[in-house]
Amino acid sequence: MEEGEHPPKRPDRRSDARERALYLLYEAQAKGISATDALELQIVEPDEMTVLLVRGVDAHRARLDEAIAARATGWSLERMPVLDLNVLRLGAFELAERQDVPVAVVIDEAVELAKRFSTDNSGRFVNGVLSALTADLRPAT
């Protein structure tokens, strides 16, 4: 390694699990099946965190969608890009149910997924909606 170079960033298993969960949520919506059913159809059993995220989003989907709809000013859920909506569901689930994950990490991870897999404006959109949802789903104690 040259002087001044940094070692390559090691992959983060939690980031990978979020990405796999996004794939499964997207697949479920595209096929018109539950996310839990999409999990069951996998040939290779997903890791524990992916399962936790997918089952959590599936179990709380109505509540998550209601919260997202309330904060996504000017956007109906039906009008949102499917990937954005599923990234928002993942982020909203983590804000509401995974108190061990810092708010900044939840939002940053969701923004990165949106930037990577959706439209040019998706990162800003996801950031804005999740930032607004923080007050609803993870009030200061």
Which role does the model predict for each range below?
Residues 1-123, 127-141:
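N-terminal interaction/assembly modules
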